[in-house]
Structure formats: structure tokens, C-alpha cells
Amino acid sequence: MSLQSLKINFAEWLLLKVKYPSQYWLGAADQPVKAAAHQKKIILTLLPSHDNLGDHAIAYASKAFLEQEYPDFDIVEVDMKDIYKSAKSLIRSRHPEDMVFIIGGGNMGDLYRYEEWTRRFIIKTFHDYRVVQLPATAHFSDTKKGRKELKRAQKIYNAHPGLLLMARDETTYQFMKQHFQEKTILKQPDMVLYLDRSKAPAEREGVYMCLREDQESVLQEEQRNRVKAALCEEFGEIKSFTTTIGRRVSRDTREHELEALWSKLQSAEAVVTDRLHGMIFCALTGTPCVVIRSFDHKVMEGYQWLKDIPFMKLIEHPEPERVTAAVNELLTKETSRAGFPRDVYFKGLRDKISGEAQ
């Protein structure tokens, strides 16, 4: 590990183990969240402020779900960085029926320490609350660090008497059943699929592409360039988009940034992507999509929720000719552009959360 990496790791450790916990224990002068004790509340937390619109879509959809399914509760949003300084105030203003919902995503495990350690802080601190972990992907690496982090997670998760875990894929579901045996575990799709942006009329033109360029991509740079060249030769100019936009996004700007991206997708004739939320955004906007598998199980298993949608097609071996053929197939196929049938998976979820249905 380089000296720069060591410095970054140490700075993050100080933040998570010293600065943020001290804000909780000492109390912060500026309480960012106000809540009334006479009103029952759902605390929605672990909310992001980085540049990944996939995570922001999860936060946006989670709030939409709670507002629709829990109209009798106030929804109190708490950003990940603010939960430490807000926790005591929220507990002091507790209503007996208050609950905590933690947004889902792909940050459960040892890869994203900030998110995982904050999740554990929430579970420990709100020990006497009903705590619901919304659909997540878990990955603890088979390393000394990964095994150590898993052991800590098991201790904290299993000690909470009212923790409900949701897995958004089969691999995570089996992992949770094996390692968090004392918890109730549900399998649910990514919360973004609760949304529907397929009804807006749109003139569609052109093929769009959104491919990863990091360690999660199954494509090497040369392969990625060959795929793009083949698409350009077949369809002309290929427009690119990304779900990581290079600027921080807040609760105030979240909806604007998401709607801008969804509007762009609604203007596409077809999309080629290897990003989980690139695929999911196509499903909710009714946009034909060719899905290229990623390095891990995340996209492959996420596709299982969408495989019956006629305008979605998975390519496991992404040779350029296969990709262009799949795009042509979708462009010439007459299919309904209805979005994801959310009622199939989300109807009755409130009863499952309360333990009244299985």
C-alpha cells in the first residue's frame, strides 16, 4: 500500500472512529434535524451526498415508497454524515412507533468502510427501534480484513432485536441467511424499481452507451473500444452518458439531476450498458436496453428481476457483433414499453416489514 493510500485510510479512520462518534457523545451545537415527539416518524438515513446517481435514485425511490406506503408517518431524512450529530436529538424526540429505515445499495461489506461503519453505528445506537435495511447487495471479501469486518457485522447485526434485512439478489440472500441467522431476511428488488417513468411521451432517436471503466467492468479497454466502434459503424454516432456525474449531489438537487438523466434516456432508441442502475433506469423509463454483464454477480442477478420485460436483453459474452445484433433485435421488435410491474414485488411490503405477512 502506498504512503498516500495509508494517509487516506488513516484520515478516514480518524473521521469514523474519532470525529463523528465525538459528535454523537458530546452533542453537536448545530442539530441538522428537528423532529417532534408527538408525531410518529420514519427516520430514513445513510443518504448519500456523492456523485453516483444510482445511489441517489435509491434514496429518492425509498422516500417515495415510504411516503406512499406510510402516509401516517412523517419521513425524516438524515444524510449519512449527519446521523452522528442528529442521533441523540432524534432519540430524545422519539414517538413509541418511530422506525429507522436504512437505504440499500451495494455498500454492505468491507469495500465501502464509511457506509458500513455508519450502518453499524445506526444499528447499535437505535437498538430499541424497529430498524429496516432496505434491499442491499452484501460483499465481504475472503481476506483477513473481510473476515474481520464480517465478524464485527455479525456481532452488531445479530444483537439488534428488531433488525430486518432485505437482499436485492439471490447471492446476498443466501449470504445473509448463512451469516445473520437470527434475523428476518427478505428478498426484494432494488428500490429504484418502485418508480415508474415509462408513461411520459418522448421522441426517441439514437443509440446511447454507458460502460464502466473500473474494476467492476468485464471489458478490457480494447474490448470496450471494439464494442463502441462496432456500434458506431452500425448505427452512426453513439451518445454516451454516465451515472457518476463528477459533482456532489444533495437532497436539494437530487430530483433535478435524476429527472435530467431519465429525460435523456427517454429520448434514446436503445441503450447499451453494464451498469446496474443504467439497466434499471432503462426499465423504469421504458427504454430498450442491451445489458452486458459486470465482473461480479450484481448485474447478472439484478437482471433476473427484469428478464421478463421484452425490451431488455442480456449479453453474457459481449463480442461486438453480438452487441450490435442485440441492439438491432430490440430496435426492430414491436413491444410494449410499459415499465417494471412494481405491484408484483412491492405490494404488501409494508405488511412484510411489520411481520404481518410473509
UniProtKB/Swiss-Prot annotation:
Gene Ontology molecular-function annotations: transferase activity
Superkingdom assignment: Bacteria
Enzyme Commission numbers on file: 2.-.-.-
N-terminal signal peptide: none
Pfam family, one: PS_pyruv_trans
EC class: transferase
Keyword tags: Exopolysaccharide synthesis, Transferase
Factors inducing expression: Repressed by SinR.
Biological process terms in GO annotation: polysaccharide biosynthetic process
Task of the protein: May be involved in the production of the exopolysaccharide (EPS) component of the extracellular matrix during biofilm formation. EPS is responsible for the adhesion of chains of cells into bundles.
Protein family membership: Belongs to the polysaccharide pyruvyl transferase family.
The protein's name: Putative pyruvyl transferase EpsI
